[in-house]
From Swiss-Prot:
It is an enzyme of class 2 (transferase). Residues 1-118 are annotated as: Disordered. One of its GO terms (molecular function) is protein-cysteine S-palmitoyltransferase activity. Residues 422, 485-494, 611-650 are lumenal. InterPro entries: Ankyrin_rpt, Ankyrin_rpt-contain_sf, Palmitoyltrfase_DHHC. It catalyses: L-cysteinyl-[protein] + hexadecanoyl-CoA = S-hexadecanoyl-L-cysteinyl-[protein] + CoA. ANK repeats lie at residues 142-172, 176-205, 213-243, 247-277, 289-318, 322-351. It is a multi-pass membrane protein. Palmitoyltransferase specific for casein kinase 1. This is Palmitoyltransferase AKR1.
Amino acid sequence: MVDKDANNELDSIPLVSEQVTNGENGELNIKASESTVGSNGAVADHEESETNNQTAVDNTENDTLDKDKLDAQPNHNEQQREADLSDAFSVKIQDESVNDKTSEPDENKDTASRKSMDGILNLSENNLDATKPEASEQELNPSLHNLMSACQQGDLTKVSELISNGEVKANDTFSDGITALHWAAINNRLTIVKYLIENDHSKADPNLLGGELKASPLHWACRNGLVYIVDYFIVHTDADPTLRDSQSYNALHLAVHSSNITLIIYLLLSCCGSTSTSKQLYVDESDNCDRTSLHWAAYQGDLLTINALLKFGADVSKIDKNLFIPLHWAFMKGYKTVLKVLAGAGSNIFAKNDQGKDSFEVAKDMNCYDTWIKVLKECGRNPKNHWEMKTIYLNPKIGKLVTFFTPYIILPIMFQVCSFYNGFVIPKLFFSVVLFAGSIYILQKLVIPTYLAEEKAIPKSPLLAGIFSGTAFWCIVTWAFNIIPTLLFKKFISNLVLSAFIYLFVWSFFKAMFINPGYVPVPSDNSVTLDQVKDLIKIGRFDTDNFCVNTFVRKPLRSKYSRFNKKLIARFDHYCPWVYNDIGVRNHKLFVVFVYSLNLAVLLFTHLSIKLFKNTEKMSGYDSDDESQKCWLLSDELCVGYKSHHFQFNLMLWCLIQYIWIAFLCLVQTFQILKGLTTWEFSSLNNRLQTHNGYNHSTLPKDFDLTSSNTNRYNSPKQSNGLSICLKLIGLDQVVLAIKLGIKSIFSHTSSVETYDPLNEFEIPTDYGFRTNWLDFWFIGDIEWRNIFYLPIEGENNLNRTVVDYYKLYEYPPKLADVDA
């Protein structure tokens, strides 16, 4: 019989009580364990019943204990469990045997069932007593647990208290081998790292390996791209960057995995350059699969890292265990720019991997074959000659001259052919379009590739500068041979002023084209660059806003890397395809003089051309009342020019079309000068208004002591699309931005009644007032007339009425309280 306590325990376990039922012929069915006993009272299969009954016990215990804790107990005796199971079923077997011999009533069957269940419940109770959970490592050593938590959270007070009281040592660990320094490093807790290394009670060892990967704290910091933590380890401790974790990765490998270009540059300068001493890293050191850092950078498609590694001599021909060179791994991402850099660096495009596949077959497997073919063609390889380098028959300088002077020939032919008054309008127009498009196509296919291997090469070629200068040349020729002989004395002042403007825009055009726009000097010694990096780290500014990762030099304020000249330009304004040069601190004044003088020259040329047409009208006896001589939509003098001077008429019309973007460019440049902005800064300001903030690779710790003043930097503009490129070519992109800001100023309001001004939402650090900004742009030094004609010798220019060197400008002059509006 089952006593009262057993019945109460049975009621307290509903899972078992619900699954225990009386079956046919008196069998005991335990559904939870899925075991069955036959009508003869024998267990069908001893091993199966043993397993199934144990399952029933486990299911019972699941309702009262945490299964994980139960399974974790090491003192569970398998033999005792089998004995308990045998005892549990002995009651049931004996009872059913008597049942077969005497055929007792059904109440005896219920008694047997209860006894069997009582045995199972007793087993469960015994197991519960035998499987009490043991305390965890954290519970056994709460002080060490508190230390780890404090390091993760950056609680310096708690860390110093635990270490100074001697409750724990800095190098104490749990069974995983992870130290407090590991947790402080990976959580970017610089003050905690410093304390653990420098305290007088228990100093941490930066070379202890821990965790599943058996990595050092330096490894953990490198894997997460934490520059300031790594710098502290390298400079102030004996942390060894050559140590390897269980995956055979050293500090440089892990830094490449992080894709933080600033950390990679730091390690290259401090450990791989000629300035490194004892902590020397080999740039081509491989892991256990023979993969170098360049292999990993190529696999990740990380262009900045690839360029940095190549700058330090990384070998593009290194092979791993699968005979893959970095180029093969680059096909995993298939980025065109990455493939082009590796191909241009001398990668063997016919190298085969362990499967016998070269770059072409790998490209097919990765669905980037077409991209690879484009890359090879842009790199100057000939598909008709086994992809060998093409033979260049034209010198690059000659190619540039041909591109530049082609419009000098094409434009006059087009203007002369388009004499629509004589008939054949469609054939003449068709011929002109074909001539213009055909010449550009020939230049793009045959001439431009001799000096520029890019897909969109037209904007970066001298073609647009040739179109402008060719137009100006034929305007000057027309003025000299048509207008001056006829109107020299009638319009003497106009001709004199026009000649002055012609001289100004021609001189400023070629001067702005050939002058150095303001290249920031790049140190030739890596030790100088490393010193610049350390200076930036000290003030918490080592990021891509303050360091150029393309040229490896500290970026002065208002500078920007030019993808046209491949150099860092001081006070960068924009790249202008019409002058075939960047506009920077040394040629910005020249560019504005060019735009202003060109604007007025176009107006005067148009004015004098109309006067010439009017003079021709009087001399030719043109009858304005004769309907047959009139022109649709044209005045009488323009009609005469259309019929009698069609070359000059077409040239004037072409100049007026160009005048649209010239006028807008004048307005925008004037507005930006008055606001103390450059074109690039104005574009970046628009992005800030739209909250498109760029990532600058900064890993500055939150607990870093910022003792220097904060610098206002502009974010880079968004990537251009087709429409924005067209707007930039004709100078309307800045107009669009100005209109956007104007619309926001009109329709956007703050929560108050006051009008919202987008330009005032962010402080412009270079805006010192309209008057000061205007004078700063035109004068170098004191405000004297002679100084307006001076051009910067290097990077000097005025800012807030003070001469500054834009090559070394790292702080803005403070604004005065009485800044003019």
